[in-house]
């Protein structure tokens, strides 16, 4: 497969441009932009006529060794490698052989033998044991591996070299440790890992305490200062639960593996502490603590390390990678071949404060989750250690019982057989579980008590008020019961204080639920019917809309209009009903009764309309009469377009339709003005209307004209009528005085309740 080749050149100018520029990419390949992939069968077969002149000349030229100038290879498909690597000998031979085979050249018959030499990995290397001593594979206990990017968490950074190995064998292993007591831990010789641990501690400590040691290597800290600082740091790291330690400079450093194991071992009270990160858990020798190592091998290792440190002029003993020096010249960094990990200039992504906040929250939540997981793991470890101790104690008890049983048999002692069998363990009830159970029962009782109080309160509200005749009162002024009864504190009911706002809120919610329930039942009752009545839900109130300018809102109004012929009938007549009207078929499931005597009208086409017409329900030519007339005349255009208005419009002054379209404007001192849309021209206020011989106006005429113009902005030629929706009392024709009396009585009844 290969990337998409550039388009072929159509003329000579484009061919030259293709030779010079199209072969090399103008910009870097971006992973965000898709690249077309071609397979070998998708590539065109190029003949010598289709190739460019430079390519044909290159393929036909004899590759002689005496030629001083080697032509550049121009291929139909890019090689995909860098420009400098394209000059590699084996790559050029393979590409040229492939192109000659493509053109059908028979001169080179061994073109198939050309290949790029690569190491053969299909064979067994017999000399591998000389370089790799670890030949045996050991199955790990778990497949979980630690993917750390910092070497501090998996081992020691310091590695022994030839000088260290010579000192370790000739000096450290022969003369140390000095035998002071017979303890196995003190008599054990120093291992290579322990030697590397001591050197690593010395390297990191001197780097933190004396960062500018290379200026004067002889002024190095003494052994007493370094050892005391390292031991104190180790003890403080073991005591705390923080995996980081704070240096003198304020930097955070991760604790070493030895200190981490020591701390975890003391926390769970189990030794030795072996992790899955070790190579072989069964044979790994435990590294002794740092204080013990410095006590046994600190002085000789320090002398050896100090000598090497001074020899290196204060720099690190271990070879390190060389990075770019920001203070040096850029050309020096580019020409230095030992600099690794060179910087690449990338455009930094812009970060917002919101992104930083989200990232911090995620890191904080992840830290909490890790702390929670660590606590769970430590709890499980402690539980398993206790189980192990319990099993060991039971095993020791079992062996003691067996020995005692054998002794009883030898001495022929009988009785006390129950002592040799394990008893049934009693269930241990923890105090925490008991307290948790008590809290749960108390919470349940409190919920039941609150529910009972709420039910009693609702029953009191639903009970009707008692009539005044039943009130216990006497004319002589005596009463059967005392108005105030003093109860002891133990018998006073513990009830919450009920406020007036809470009672009114519950009452309003009860009324709202009752109204919604009635509306739901009415909706279920009217399901499957087409409502053509004047006003099924609101009280009847005839509103004349003949003079309305905009009729699109009438079918969706809260009060239905009585003049149906003024708006489109398709809003409430579906296609099925239109089809029945056109075919003169009776409506299915519809029965019509006469309004005068209740007689059933025979089933025929539109009996309900005919009965209404015979009864002369309306004297004027209304909607039903027009509908019957259109059925008789076979004119069904009114179903879609509506009936024309036959009532002449009054020529009175126009009345503004409600709602009005106005604009809200805030003036000086926070005053609010409502501006109407100026649809009519303003009169000319500047016309001189002063009469001859009249009294001259001493006030400024310009101010008066401005006031008239401002007043005209808020005026309109329509007569604004007060909408009935702003005063609900007008729906039933109630006068304002009667409405005020009704409102006062309503407030009085509410206060009594």
From Swiss-Prot:
InterPro entries (UniProt xref): Enhancer_polycomb, Enhancer_polycomb-like_N
Main location: nucleus
Bias type Basic and acidic residues, positions: 429-449
Positions with biased composition (Polar residues): 46-71
Presence of the UniProt keyword Signal in the record: no
Region of interest: Disordered: 1-75, 429-490
TM segment ranges: none
Keyword field: Cell cycle, DNA damage, DNA repair, Nucleus, Transcription, Transcription regulation
Subcellular localization(s) per the UniProt record: Nucleus
Comp. bias (Low complexity): 450-463
Record's GO cellular component terms: NuA4 histone acetyltransferase complex; nucleosome; nucleus; piccolo histone acetyltransferase complex
One of the protein's GO biological processes: positive regulation of macroautophagy
One Pfam family it belongs to: EPL1
Signal sequence extent: none
Gene Ontology terms for molecular function: histone acetyltransferase activity
Task performed by this protein: Component of the NuA4 histone acetyltransferase complex which is involved in transcriptional activation of selected genes principally by acetylation of nucleosomal histone H4 and H2A. The NuA4 complex is also involved in DNA repair. Involved in gene silencing by neighboring heterochromatin, blockage of the silencing spreading along the chromosome, and required for cell cycle progression through G2/M.
PANTHER family: ENHANCER OF POLYCOMB
Family statement drawn from the similarity comment of this UniProt entry: Belongs to the enhancer of polycomb family.
Subunit structure as annotated in this protein's UniProt entry: Component of the NuA4 histone acetyltransferase complex.
Name of the protein in its database record: Enhancer of polycomb-like protein 1
Protein's organism: Candida albicans (strain SC5314 / ATCC MYA-2876) (Yeast)
């Amino acid at each position: 497969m290969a990337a998409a080749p550039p388009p072929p050149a159509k003329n000579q100018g484009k061919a030259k441009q293709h030779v010079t520029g199209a072969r090399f990419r103008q910009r870097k390949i971006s992973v965000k932009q898709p690249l077309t992939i071609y397979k070998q069968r998708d590539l065109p077969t190029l003949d010598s006529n289709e190739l460019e002149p430079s390519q044909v000349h290159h393929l036909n030229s004899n590759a002689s060794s005496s030629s001083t100038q080697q032509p550049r290879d121009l291929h139909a498909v890019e090689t995909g490698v860098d420009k400098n690597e394209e000059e590699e000998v084996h790559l050029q031979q393979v590409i040229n052989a492939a192109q000659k085979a493509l053109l059908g050249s028979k001169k080179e018959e061994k073109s198939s033998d050309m290949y790029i030499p690569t190491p053969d990995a299909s064979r067994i290397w017999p000399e591998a044991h000389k370089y790799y001593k670890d030949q045996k594979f050991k199955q790990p206990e778990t497949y979980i591996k630690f993917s750390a990017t910092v070497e501090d968490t998996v081992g020691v950074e310091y590695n022994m070299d030839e000088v260290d190995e010579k000192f370790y064998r000739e000096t450290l292993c022969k003369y140390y440790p000095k035998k002071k007591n017979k303890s196995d831990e003190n008599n054990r010789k120093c291992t290579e890992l322990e030697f590397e641990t001591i050197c690593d501690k010395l390297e990191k400590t001197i780097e933190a305490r004396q960062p500018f040691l290379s200026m004067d290597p002889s002024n190095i800290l003494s052994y007493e200062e370094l050892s005391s600082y390292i031991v104190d740091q180790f003890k403080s790291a073991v005591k705390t639960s923080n995996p980081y330690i704070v240096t003198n400079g304020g930097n955070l450093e991760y604790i070493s593996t030895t200190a981490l194991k020591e701390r975890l071992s003391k926390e769970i009270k189990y030794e030795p502490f072996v992790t899955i990160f070790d190579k072989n858990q069964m044979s790994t020798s435990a590294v002794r603590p740092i204080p013990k190592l410095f006590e046994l091998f600190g002085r000789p290792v320090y002398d050896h390390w100090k000598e090497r440190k001074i020899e290196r002029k204060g720099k690190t003993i271990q070879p390190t990678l060389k990075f770019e020096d920001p203070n040096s010249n850029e050309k020096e960094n580019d020409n230095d071949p030992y600099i690794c990990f060179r910087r690449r200039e990338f455009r930094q992504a812009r970060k917002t404060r919101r992104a930083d906040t989200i990232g911090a929250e995620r890191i904080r939540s992840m830290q909490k989750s890790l702390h929670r997981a660590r606590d769970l793991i430590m709890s499980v470890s402690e539980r398993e250690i206790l189980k192990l101790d319990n099993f060991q104690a039971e095993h020791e008890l079992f062996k003691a019982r067996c020995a005692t049983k054998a002794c009883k048999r030898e001495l022929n002692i009988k009785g006390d057989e129950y002592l040799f069998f394990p008893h049934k363990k009693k269930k241990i009830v923890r105090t925490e579980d008991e307290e948790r159970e008590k809290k749960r029962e108390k919470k349940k009782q409190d919920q039941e008590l609150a529910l009972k109080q709420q039910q009693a309160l609702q029953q009191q509200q639903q009970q009707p008020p008692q009539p005044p005749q039943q009130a216990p009162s006497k004319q002589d002024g005596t009463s059967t019961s005392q108005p105030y009864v003093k109860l002891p504190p133990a018998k006073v009911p513990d009830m919450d204080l009920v406020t007036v706002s809470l009672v009114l809120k519950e009452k309003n919610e009860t009324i709202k639920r009752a109204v919604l329930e009635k509306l739901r039942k009415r909706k279920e009752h009217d399901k499957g019917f087409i409502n053509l009545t004047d006003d099924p839900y609101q009280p009847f109130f005839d509103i004349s809309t003949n003079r309305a300018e905009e009729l699109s809102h009438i079918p969706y109004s809260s009060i239905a209009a009585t003049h149906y012929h003024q708006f489109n009938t398709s809003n409430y007549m579906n296609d099925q009903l239109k089809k029945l009207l056109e075919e003169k078929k009776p409506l299915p499931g519809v029965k019509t009764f006469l309004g005068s005597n209740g007689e059933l009208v025979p089933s025929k086409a539109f009996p309900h309309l005919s009965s209404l017409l015979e009864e002369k329900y309306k004297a004027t030519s209304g909607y039903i009469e027009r509908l019957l007339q259109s059925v008789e005349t076979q004119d069904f255009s009114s179903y879609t377009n509506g009936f024309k208005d036959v009532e002449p419009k009054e020529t009175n002054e126009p009345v503004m339709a409600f709602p009005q379209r106005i604009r809200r404007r805030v003036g000086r001192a926070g005053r609010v003005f409502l501006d109407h849309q100026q649809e009519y021209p303003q009169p000319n206020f500047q016309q001189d209307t002063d009469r001859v011989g009249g009294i001259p106006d001493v006030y400024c005429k310009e101010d008066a004209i401005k006031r008239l113009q401002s007043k005209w902005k808020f005026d309109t030629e329509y007569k604004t009528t007060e909408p009935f929706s702003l005063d609900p009392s007008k729906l039933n024709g109630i006068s304002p005085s009667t409405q005020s009396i009704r409102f006062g009585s309503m407030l009085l009844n509410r206060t009594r309740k």
